[in-house]
């Protein structure tokens, strides 16, 4: 899609200018929808948790509270960013940007449809997402150190140890997907699940599906893995000294990563943009008019609801329990399942291994 735009611009502009304009439009096309979705995901979270606690949630700004995210954004932008006197001022400001940039950059390879709606359809898409998403921990560590606060530093140490621990399990879960799909291209992984719900990878990789999603909860510091910002223990964790828009940027990064994990889970395990009724007589023709991106967004919405549901349901783990779950449960399970998938690959278990 963007290649055609670049070719058209090159017909009456300098080549370098056409490339520059195309790259800027690609960045805007990726960043703007993500930021808009993040804004209203915060509203959805407050509404969902409110209903689970038998209350209304935000309902004052706009009809049904729909304009609450705009009010929150205005409030964050008009607040002062207070920089602690003894902090490292430059790193203190840079840290939120370092946390947000990887969460946004990872979206460059996420496909949204079978028609090539993707900013960069590279062959090593899975490796790119895993590598870029892991960089976000640097922003968290730097924020804790630069704040010159013991609470912030403790939260940063917790977050870094937690992310490193669960990235191993997440990486092994991705290895099993690559063994089944035989490609690291995200579009190719989705196309390998064509043929109906029984061809999706969640069936042969069911333990990996749960491991990946649980690791995603831990990676994003979401409940019940939110010890890095445990209010009852270390006030607010690594961003305890932040205020205003600098504080909001950390939340943008967290929610952008939530959406990214949901998209990756839907793409790798739940058939991406393919209909769950594909191959089912009667139902396939009834739902054939629904575009592929609608199915993808529906799956992502369900996974995001699980993020919100878990926050409202489960109590926070202790730090030692989180480490034990990552190192003594999830990693051994993933290693065992790598061997199981290898056996299924050897015997060509149909329909996933052909």
Swiss-Prot record:
One of its GO terms (biological process) is aerobic respiration. It holds the Pfam family NADHdh. It is an enzyme of class 7 (translocase). GO terms for molecular function: NADH dehydrogenase activity; oxidoreductase activity, acting on NAD(P)H, quinone or similar compound as acceptor; quinone binding. It is found in: Cell inner membrane. InterPro entries: NADH_UbQ_OxRdtase_su1/FPO (IPR001694), NADH_UbQ_OxRdtase_su1_CS (IPR018086). It is a multi-pass membrane protein. Its EC number is 7.1.1.-. The keyword NAD applies. Its main location: membrane. It catalyses: a quinone + NADH + 5 H(+)(in) = a quinol + NAD(+) + 4 H(+)(out). The keyword Cell membrane applies. Keywords: Cell inner membrane, Cell membrane, Membrane, NAD, Quinone, Translocase, Transmembrane, Transmembrane helix, Ubiquinone. The chain crosses the membrane at residues 16-36, 90-110, 126-146, 170-190, 197-217, 249-269, 290-310, 329-349. PROSITE patterns: COMPLEX1_ND1_2. GO terms for cellular component: plasma membrane. Belongs to the complex I subunit 1 family. NDH-1 is composed of 14 different subunits. Subunits NuoA, H, J, K, L, M, N constitute the membrane sector of the complex. NDH-1 shuttles electrons from NADH, via FMN and iron-sulfur (Fe-S) centers, to quinones in the respiratory chain. The immediate electron acceptor for the enzyme in this species is believed to be ubiquinone. Couples the redox reaction to proton translocation (for every two electrons transferred, four hydrogen ions are translocated across the cytoplasmic membrane), and thus conserves the redox energy in a proton gradient. This subunit may bind ubiquinone. HAMAP family: NDH1_NuoH (MF_01350). This is NADH-quinone oxidoreductase subunit H.
């Amino acid at each position: 899609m963007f290649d055609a735009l670049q070719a058209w611009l090159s017909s009456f502009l300098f080549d370098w200018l056409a490339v520059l304009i195309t790259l800027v439009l690609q960045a805007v096309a990726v960043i703007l929808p993500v930021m808009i979705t993040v804004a209203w995901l915060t509203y959805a979270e407050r509404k969902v948790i409110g209903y689970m606690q038998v209350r209304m949630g935000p309902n004052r700004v706009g009809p049904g509270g729909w304009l609450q995210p705009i009010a929150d954004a205005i409030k964050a932008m008009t607040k002062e960013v207070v920089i602690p006197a003894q902090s490292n001022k430059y790193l203190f400001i840079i840290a939120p940007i370092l946390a947000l940039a990887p969460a946004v950059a990872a979206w460059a390879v996420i496909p949204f449809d079978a028609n090539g709606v993707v900013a960069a359809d590279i062959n090593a898409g899975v490796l790119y997402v895993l590598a870029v998403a892991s960089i976000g921990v640097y922003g968290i560590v730097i924020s804790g150190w630069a704040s010159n606060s013991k609470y912030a530093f403790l939260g940063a140490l917790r977050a870094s140890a937690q992310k490193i621990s669960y990235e191993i399990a997440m990486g092994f879960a991705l290895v099993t997907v690559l063994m089944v799909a035989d490609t690291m291209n995200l579009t190719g992984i989705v196309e390998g699940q064509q043929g109906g719900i029984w061809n999706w990878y969640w069936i042969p990789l069911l333990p990996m599906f749960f491991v990946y999603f649980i690791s995603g909860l831990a990676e994003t510091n979401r409940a019940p893995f939110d010890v890095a910002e445990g209010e009852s223990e270390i006030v607010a964790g690594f961003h305890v000294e932040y205020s205003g828009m600098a504080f909001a940027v950390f939340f943008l990064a967290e929610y952008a990563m939530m959406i990214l994990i949901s998209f990756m889970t839907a793409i790798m395990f739940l058939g991406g943009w393919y209909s769950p009724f594909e191959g089912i007589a009667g139902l396939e023709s009834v739902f054939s008019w629904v575009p592929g991106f609608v199915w993808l967004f529906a799956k992502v919405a369900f996974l995001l609801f699980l993020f919100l549901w878990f926050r409202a349901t489960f109590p926070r783990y202790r730090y030692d329990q989180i480490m034990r779950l990552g190192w003594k449960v999830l990693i051994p399970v993933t290693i065992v399942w790598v061997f199981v998938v290898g056996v299924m690959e050897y015997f060509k278990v149909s329909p996933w291994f052909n």
